[in-house]
Structures are given as structure tokens and as C-alpha cells.
Amino acid sequence: MSQTPFNPNSPSVPTTTSLPSTDFSQIPYDVLESIRNRLNQIRQSLTKLADQINNHNRHPQKIKLPSYSYFQNQFQVLITQLMSITNQLYNNEDLLRNTNVYPTPIFPTSAHENMLTTLLRKKVAPEVDEWINGAKLIMENETKNKLDNQQVEIDILKIDQWVQWCLAKIQDLRDEFQFYGFHTVEELDHMETPQGKQEIKEKKDKEFEREQIELKITAGGQKSLHPNQVLKFMCQGQI
């Protein structure tokens, strides 16, 4: 019995179909990889910071929190990382919005199923959605505060204008009067009477006694300023 030689091109034998080559020339690998690395750095920094705080909360007597300067440096690093990834996302916004992600035939779906479902997710995760809404709320509050501050500036400007008007009005009223000393016309007329002269003499005697007492108790025997001198200095800048 003769045997038919094995023919690999026979239709009954399955052949391996070669996959078409995929063109990745339009994909900015460097930018996407940089974003991924930045996200990984932020995740590691936050994880380390959270572990330090949680360990201290669980064992406050055994594990102490780092110094304030350490936390300040860590926050500065996080801010720098967030600013960097924000700029990269902003510069590649069109690319990230318009790029359709799909697995190639050689993608290891079994080993990286979670990654695949994450990449193909059309709706953001609940925690991300909450973070975005919180950021929008903060921006709305800041905008409202700016408007309120502008209104406050307008109110302050009106107050300044009102103060200027008051000063001008006081100056106009002051120009209509003549001020000599600290007594009214009625008081000056009373001081010319015998009773008024007697009151002035008694007042001067009391002031002299008070000045003598002050000279004994003040440092260096210096004479204190009279209240009228203080008022004159406050009003006219003269002693």
C-alpha cells in the first residue's frame, strides 16, 4: 500500500495567517508614557503620605508623624507633579479626546483584563466624577468670590468718594467761622464779669498747684502738656 507524501500546502491542513502590520507612527508614545509615569509618581507619593498618616493614627505612641517641613516639602512635590501632568493633559487635550482606544489582536486580554476594561471605559469612575464636580464647584465659588470682591471694591470706592465729600464739606464749614482759643462768645463775655474773673483766678491757682505736684513726680521735673495744648496739636499740629 503506497503512502501519499505529506503536503503542507494541502487545503486540509490549516495554515497560520500572518497579521497585518500596525502603524503606530501617529501615536505620541513619549507624551503618553510621560503622563503614565507622572500618574504613577503621584500615586506613589500619595500612597506613601497616606501610609505615614494612617500608621500614626493606628499606633500614635509608637509611630510619630514626620516634621512639618517634611510635609511641606511633600506637598510641594505633589503640587509640582500635578502642575506637570495638568500641562501635559492640557497640551494633548485634542489627542486624548479624539483617540479611540481598542485592543489589537495580540493584546493579552486574559492577563490584563482590568486594564482593558479601564481603557475602554466611556464613563469616568465615580470617585473621578466626584473630584471633577468638586473642582467645578471650587471654580464657581472662586468666580463668585471675584464678583463679590469687585462689588466690594466698588463699594469701597463709593465710601472713599463720600469721605472726600465730607472732608470738603467740613473745610467749607470751617472757612465760614473764625476760631480763636477754646471758648465761645458767651464764655468770653462771662469771663469779663467779676464772677468770671474770680473763677479764672481759682482755676489758675488749681492748675498751678497741679503743675507743682506734677513737677515733683515726673521724671526730670518736666512739665506735662496742658489738655488745651494737646487738642491744639491734634487739630493744628502746633504746640
From Swiss-Prot:
Q: Where in the cell is it found?
A: Nucleus
Encoding gene (name): MED8
Q: Which InterPro entries match?
A: Mediatior_Med8_fun/met
| Superkingdom of this protein's organism | Eukaryota
What protein does this entry describe? Mediator of RNA polymerase II transcription subunit 8
Q: Could you tell me the Gene Ontology terms of the biological process aspect for this record?
A: regulation of transcription by RNA polymerase II
- The organism of origin for this protein: Candida albicans (strain SC5314 / ATCC MYA-2876)
This protein's assembly is summarised as: Component of the Mediator complex.
- Which positions are tagged coiled coil? 30-59
Main function = Component of the Mediator complex, a coactivator involved in the regulated transcription of nearly all RNA polymerase II-dependent genes. Mediator functions as a bridge to convey information from gene-specific regulatory proteins to the basal RNA polymerase II transcription machinery. Mediator is recruited to promoters by direct interactions with regulatory proteins and serves as a scaffold for the assembly of a functional preinitiation complex with RNA polymerase II and the general transcription factors.
User: Could you tell me which residues belong to the region Disordered?
Assistant: 1-21
Keyword vocabulary terms for this entry: Activator, Coiled coil, Nucleus, Transcription, Transcription regulation
Q: Which family does it belong to?
A: Belongs to the Mediator complex subunit 8 family.
Gene Ontology molecular functions: RNA polymerase II cis-regulatory region sequence-specific DNA binding; transcription coregulator activity
According to the UniProt record, one GO cellular component term is: mediator complex
Primary location recorded for the protein, binned into one broad class? nucleus
